[in-house]
Amino acid sequence: IFAAYAFITQVFIIMISGLNVFKPYVVNSFLLAMGTFIVLALLYLVLTVLVAKFVTTKTAPKWMLSIGVVLILATVTGNIFALLLGISLIQKTRTKDASAIEKWQKLWQKILRNTMALHGLFFIVFMFSLSVVSSWTFDYDFATKNNYAELLQSPSLEYPLGTDDYGRDLFSRIVFGAQISLIVGFFATIIPGVVGGVLGAISGYYGKRTDNIIMRLLDVLYAIPGILL
């Protein structure tokens, strides 16, 4: 099912990115990116058939190991389903411990049985992938530069969601806004994790006194209202 959803996600990316052909011009990387997306979509479609034919719940042919590596590399486009499929194939071709594979299968079976959870996961992966590849297929100028000749345009093929009162393409603004939100969210998650890990390592290494000092400093920090921070 990962292969099928990787294919569907890629098709949606191609459809959304393809709307840029109706604009006056496209970015230099547009044709190369779209060609790559089409190749990946065909790969996922072929894999959907191959996985259904050759892969069982616990095993996969040895020759699928290289395909798993390619799928992991393809995750650079943000298609998390490709990553999950790649991990699953590598695990089934290399792992001899059936219990480890069963744990992985049970984890995803619980999610896949829940239709709403699966649809939510698809939407998240789609938005993530679109945010990742938007720099290759969308022109940033349409989202930021004022175009007074195109003020408040109604939705059309050229401007799927119309333009604002400065003539900027609302569709492009939403796509790049999602990209910025993704970057901010990523660093907002990573930085506290790194800082917390470093402080935890220091307190564990130097012992109780250092741990108490760090905890009291953090208590002072937590006492400050978040809006001031």
Question: PLM features: what roles do these ranges have?
Answer:
Residues 54-58, 133-137, 187-218:
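Transmembrane-helix boundary motif in ABC transporter permease subunits
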Residues 66-88:
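Hydrophobic, aromatic-rich membrane-embedded alpha-helical segments
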Residues 93, 214-229:
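Generic hydrophobic transmembrane alpha-helix motif, especially the helices
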Residues 1-10, 38-52, 68-71, 82, ...:
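N-terminal signal-anchor/first transmembrane alpha helix
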Residues 28-42:
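Alpha-helical transmembrane segments of polytopic membrane proteins
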Residues 41-44, 170-205:
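Transmembrane alpha-helix signature in integral membrane proteins
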Residues 12-26, 51-56:
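Juxtamembrane "helix-exit" motif on the non-cytosolic side of transmembrane helices
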Residues 24-27, 107-110, 144-186:
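Periplasmic/extracellular loop-to-transmembrane helix junction in inner-membrane transport proteins
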